[in-house]
Amino acid sequence: MEFRFALAGDPVAHSLSPAMHRAALEEAGLAGVYELVRCDPAEFRGLVDKLKAGEFSGLNVTMPHKRLAYTLCDHMTDEAGLANSVNTMKVLGSLIWGHSSDVVAFRKAIVDVGDPKSIILIGTGGSARAALAAFHGPVYVWGRSAEKTESLKIQFPGRVFPFEDSPVGSVLVNCTPIGMKGELLPAMLLEKAGGLIDLPYGYGETPAVSWATGNGLPVVDGYEFLAVQAAESFHWWTGVEVGPSTMAAAARNG
């Protein structure tokens, strides 16, 4: 059997997922390919139809389609249900199943940065929902969309608060692309930081990771997060466990 996986979203050209999954397939002794599919919402729906028809073994989903993916699933794991967001899809029988390997990765990342009492969530999309599903303390949101922030408050009642009320020492959780083009997070955020979970990745460290490391703060960077998320997706699709270290090494080597 040859597996066929793909990452769907826009943008996807920068993704390191193909390198990670090729490494996982090789270590597991499995045949397969991992593709990148840039798509708009209508094209994504067509891709899900192809998944259901058996043309793909599994899909990863990235921005901006994680919420749409959630609505297209027949069944979902507890993690996806908690997050109201799906980043991993497969077919069992004739039904589409959704999972959030983001939630799994956030649970580990939160422990790795010292199990903080509060976090400052940067962004309001699907990854942000996964962070909220994984963390059970107060969450202070810094986002551009008041509508999306209000949606988070409705989904997670009593858990979401305005950034202005956030205490110093909160862990920053960056679920936006800020940093991918070499830009630093705003000073108002850094002033509150007691640690950092930084999802963006690019060539080397993002400025936020360099800043946090230089200030002696606990950090989980985008490569580490992506590797745990990818290993979880691979196991959910294939039933084979491949260590995140294999994925992380492949990601850092491009």
Regions found by a protein language model. Give the residues of each.
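Conserved beta-strand positions in the Rossmann-like core of class I SAM-dependent methyltransferases
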Residues: 35, 140, 220
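NAD(P)-binding Rossmann-fold cofactor-contacting core
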Residues: 137-156
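Rossmann-like adenosine-cofactor binding region
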Residues: 156-220
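Short helix-loop-beta connector
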Residues: 92, 113-119, 191-192
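Phosphate/diphosphate ligand-binding glycine-rich loop within oxidoreductases
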Residues: 2-113, 203, 215
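Rossmann-fold NAD(P)-binding glycine/threonine-rich loop
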Residues: 197-244, 248-250
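Glycine-rich adenosine-cofactor-binding loop
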Residues: 9, 100-103, 110, 117-136, ...
